[in-house]
Amino acid sequence: LDSGHGGDDPGKIGVNQAKEKDVNLEIARKIKKRLEKKGWEVVMTREKDEMLGDPQAGNNKIHDMKARVEIINKTMPQAAVSIHQNSYQDEQIRGAQVFYYSHSEEGKRMAEQMQKALLTVDETNTRQAKANDTYYLLKRTEVPTIIVECGFLSNPEEAAKLTDAKYQKKMADAITKGIIACVEN
């Protein structure tokens, strides 16, 4: 379970000043707790507000991404799920969306399953799982990996929800169900 950004890298800053790194970590912690209650072993790439990799090594962002990939490839989980929040210049844009590596059939299947699970949070969400061939994490991991963008911090209504503990629990429940469906099917 990868909680995107952290430390000096806040990720997106919401219209409500929420930092993506904090929202990601809160949701990831909730997912971890739910999966462990079901007897699953969960490896987190980060469990606190930090960047990964060697802070003395120059471009921290590159080293952070390499460290995340290394953790995933070393532990070789059945699947990897990276938690993120989206942003766009048009504040009307909203909805959770799942990305997968365009050359991964297993990733596509997982992303579609997860996108379906996210409908339990917002039935009006019309977004579809989307292929991507440029995201470093998707390209470099050796296991099926998806990125779950839980919503848009640039949308005032969604930013308020994403920083609300009850909504985060609802999102974590949906993602947990999605992970279980992905791995068990």
What is the predicted function of each stretch?
Residues 30, 34, 117, 178:
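Rossmann-fold NAD(P)-dependent oxidoreductase module
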Residues 75, 89, 126-185:
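Active-site-adjacent mobile loop/cap segments within catalytic or ligand-binding domains
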Residues 107-131:
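Active-site-adjacent substrate-binding region
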